[in-house]
Amino acid sequence: ELNDNILIKVESNVLREWTDKVLMAKNDVSFEISESNFVCSASSTELGKVIHSEPMNGKRIDTVAVRENVNITLSFQATKSMLIFSNCGEMFIIGFSNQQPSRLKVELGDGSYLCLYVAPKNKKEK
């Protein structure tokens, strides 16, 4: 079973905004998430560094659990998969992990759900 380092709940439009914004860089995406702040960023030669930052437990992110801070990099394709997956429902539970795949879960009703797992890049791959 996966043990998330940080578990949050967000609406699909929030997830789409994050991923759509950083995917403009057309590069890998870094996630730095703490108990108080959510930051995702990507760099490109054309745009420089594209950053999205917002507080945890603010108006748009509901923190469910925090075990330890998360500092991971997801590939461009993994992040693009998150964007596509964000169209599958209205509310998402996202579990970020430093050592295991991160997961996006959407409830479909009647106890059924759909999950997407995305593995972080190895530190050597950067």
Question: What residue ranges belong to the model's regions?
Answer:
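DNA polymerase processivity clamps
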Residues: 4-56, 60, 64-126
